[in-house]
């Protein structure tokens, strides 16, 4: 039996530390002792992919071509050409067997595998000590020690996720202050006001006569659920046909409405109702996963590589400050978004609702992830005043210290992409003034005071937040895909090459809500509050049509 075929035994060979997995325990967390050794759990292992450099180069080449002429990779062939190798999966299975773990499932295209077993086996396999922690925000499981594996297999493992169960993301929606009498009372008040998604789409001049037919929009959810009766009630009230909605269970999570409109149900039904109202001809696949680093990644990879539903658009309204993620988790997620770009899947994510700090209290400026990924279309927030079906006024959404504000700023993790080099992205406001990926790319109505009329758990309410902007523009992309007859895919590089009149430039406001210096201001052209501005839908479609004269990056 060769060394490669021989099962590993504890102490048989040196172990190597997997870099990028360190995560400090939360302030105020209290160590409550070890997790019971016979408790069962699962982790997601991310394996290296084949020809990783070739995939990135392919995406870069295709990004320089007009969207209608791009050659996206096919899901059917992706696993063989760019997934993890079958040899690596075989090595992982031997490692699992040797440590008393089961390889429950493998996603060859995504290069991920789920290993499960008792805590004692996980501790031995990865060289950690799993422990329980109590915190004012909730209890969680984490670990002491560095994540290690046998040195011979360390080069093939890029991440081990799921050891820590702390939530990695929060939903980016905010309820409008309630008014008595439902929608009618709100509409009669001077302020605040509310719009239906149809109103907002009209103001942004979404192309008419299109409904997303032939497209599948994936929606990522990390909690809550939707009530079919609520959805039916809502779409009937708008006079639009109810779209087909299916739920997909990931890592044991499922469609589980809580009955609390202000909880995660608010996010789930907001996403479906906004996008569904504007693309009722599309199929909607809602991927439910646990709110952990493993769950979030598995939801993304399941959607992107879904061989049956084949989403062409992915909408994400959950996220967290990029600095709160481990570097291994961010790299794994970003790799999945690269897969999406190669496959022609447009991924959109909310930029956050807590202004230029993204809710952190460390005195620094932060952007939200996954919106910060260069392969994700980051969606910021505005305050929209519409009149006669057109924009009367649009400014940066900022409700001040007692409210919310659009996320935005400069990434401390992702470098400035080539396609933003001429966008005048400022240096980071943090010490060192480093350059980085500018967030957001586009913006749309997000202020709860000018929010969206929706029905959550059977209750009529008004919701804002950048959570609404991701599904709003996901529906726009679905309409454009329908018209083009193919998916536009990775849009970011193209958007920055389009004429300025494709967007409504937003030049008033800032996203500081911490009573500090107003570092990030709106202004002409791209800015770290609203990106390029709000898209003018018909002009964006026209610019992407084959007949358009498109500048090449």
UniProtKB/Swiss-Prot annotation:
Q: Which Gene3D superfamilies match?
A: Peptidase S8/S53 domain
Q: Which InterPro entries match?
A: Peptidase_S8/S53_dom, Peptidase_S8/S53_dom_sf, S53_propep, Sedolisin_dom, Tripeptidyl-peptidase_I
Q: How does activity depend on pH?
A: Optimum pH is 3.9 (for degradation of azocoll). Stable at pH 3.5 to 5.0.
Query: What is said about its interaction partners and assembly?
Result: Monomer.
User: What EC identifiers does the entry list?
Assistant: 3.4.21.-
Q: Which organism is it from?
A: Alicyclobacillus sendaiensis
Q: How is it modified after translation?
A: Autocatalytically processed.
Activity regulation (UniProt): Partially inhibited by L-alanyl-L-alanyl-L-phenylalanyl-chloromethane, leupeptin, 1 mM Fe(2+) or 1 mM Hg(2+). Insensitive to specific inhibitors of aspartic proteinases, such as pepstatin and diazoacetyl-DL-norleucine methyl ester (DAN), to specific inhibitors of metalloproteinases (EDTA), cysteine proteinases (N-ethylmaleimide) and serine proteinases (PMSF).
This chain is encoded by the gene named scpA
List, alphabetically, the PROSITE patterns matched: SEDOLISIN
Q: What induces it?
A: Constitutively expressed.
What's this protein's function? Thermostable pepstatin-insensitive serine-carboxyl proteinase. Can specifically and efficiently degrade collagen. In vitro, preferentially cleaves the bovine collagen alpha-1 chain at a single specific cleavage site. Can also hydrolyze the chromogenic substrate azocoll and synthetic peptides derived from collagen. Also shows low activity with albumin and casein, but cannot use keratin azure and elastin.
Please give the name of this protein: Kumamolisin-As
Gene Ontology terms for molecular function: metal ion binding; serine-type endopeptidase activity; tripeptidyl-peptidase activity
Could you share any additional remarks the record makes about this protein? Answer: Kumamolisin-As does not make a specific three-quarters/one-quarter cut of the triple-helical, native collagen, characteristic for the previously described collagenases.
Residues noted as binding Ca(2+) in the record, renumbered to the chain? 505-506, 523, 525, 527
Tell me the cofactor note. Answer: Binds 1 Ca(2+) ion per subunit.
One CC-aspect GO term: extracellular region
Cofactors per UniProt? Answer: Ca(2+)
Major subcellular site = secreted
Task: List, alphabetically, the Pfam families matched.
Answer: Peptidase_S8, Pro-kuma_activ
Q: Where is the active site?
A: 267, 271, 467
Q: Which UniProt keywords apply?
A: Calcium, Hydrolase, Metal-binding, Protease, Secreted, Serine protease, Zymogen
């Amino acid at each position: 039996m060769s060394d490669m075929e021989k099962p590993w035994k504890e102490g048989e060979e040196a172990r190597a530390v997997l870099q990028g997995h360190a995560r400090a325990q939360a302030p105020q967390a209290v160590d409550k002792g070890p997790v019971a050794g016979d408790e069962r759990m699962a982790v997601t292992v991310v394996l290296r992919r084949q020809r990783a450099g070739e995939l990135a180069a392919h995406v870069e080449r295709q990004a320089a071509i007009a969207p209608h002429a791009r050659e996206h990779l096919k899901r059917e062939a992706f696993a063989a050409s760019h997934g993890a190798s079958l040899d690596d999966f075989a090595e992982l299975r031997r490692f699992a067997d040797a440590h008393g773990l089961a390889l429950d499932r493998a996603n060859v295209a995504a290069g991920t595998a789920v290993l499960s077993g008792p805590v004692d086996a996980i501790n031995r396999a990865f060289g950690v000590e799993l422990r329980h922690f109590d915190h004012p925000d909730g209890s969680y499981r984490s670990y002491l020690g560095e994540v290690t594996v046998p040195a011979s297999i360390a080069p093939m493992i890029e991440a081990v996720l799921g050891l820590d169960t702390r939530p990695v993301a929060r939903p980016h929606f905010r309820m409008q202050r309630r008014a008595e009498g439902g929608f009618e009372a709100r509409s009669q008040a001077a302020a605040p006001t509310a719009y239906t998604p149809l109103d907002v789409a009209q103001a942004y001049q979404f192309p008419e006569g299109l409904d997303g037919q032939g497209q599948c929009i994936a929606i990522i959810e990390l909690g809550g659920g939707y009530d079919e009766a609520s959805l039916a009630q809502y779409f009937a009230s708008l006079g639009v046909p109810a779209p087909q909605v299916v739920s997909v269970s990931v890592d044991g999570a499922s469609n589980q409405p809580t009955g609390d409109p202000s909880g995660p149900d608010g996010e789930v039904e907001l996403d479906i109702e906004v996008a569904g109202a504007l693309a009722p001809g599309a199929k909607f696949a809602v991927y439910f996963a646990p709110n952990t680093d493993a769950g979030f990644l598995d939801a993304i990879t399941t959607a992107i590589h879904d061989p049956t539903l084949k989403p062409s658009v992915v909408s994400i309204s959950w996220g967290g400050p990029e600095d709160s993620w481990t570097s291994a988790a961010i790299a794994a997620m970003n790799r999945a978004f690269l897969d999406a770009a190669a496959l022609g899947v447009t991924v959109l994510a909310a930029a956050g609702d807590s202004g230029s700090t993204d809710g952190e209290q460390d005195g620094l400026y932060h952007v939200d992830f996954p919106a910060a990924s260069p392969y994700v279309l980051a969606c910021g927030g505005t305050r929209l005043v519409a009149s006669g079906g057109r924009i009367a006024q649009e400014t940066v959404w900022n409700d001040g210290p007692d409210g919310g504000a659009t996320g935005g700023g400069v990434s401390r993790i992702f470098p400035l992409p080539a396609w933003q080099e001429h966008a005048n992205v400022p240096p980071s406001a943090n010490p060192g003034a480093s350059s980085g990926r500018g967030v957001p790319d586009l913006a749309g109505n997000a202020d709860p005071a000018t929010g969206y009329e929706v029905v959550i758990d059977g209750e009529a309410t008004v919701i804002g937040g950048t959570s609404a902007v991701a599904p709003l523009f996901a529906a726009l992309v679905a309409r454009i895909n329908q018209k083009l007859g193919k998916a536009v895919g990775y849009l970011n590089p193209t958007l920055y090459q389009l004429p300025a009149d494709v967007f409504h430039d937003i030049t008033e406001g800032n996203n500081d809500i911490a009573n500090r210096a107003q570092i990030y201001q709106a202004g002409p052209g791209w800015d770290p509050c609203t990106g390029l501005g709000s898209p003018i839908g018909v002009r964006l479609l026209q610019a992407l049509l084959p007949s358009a004269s498109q500048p090449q990056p």
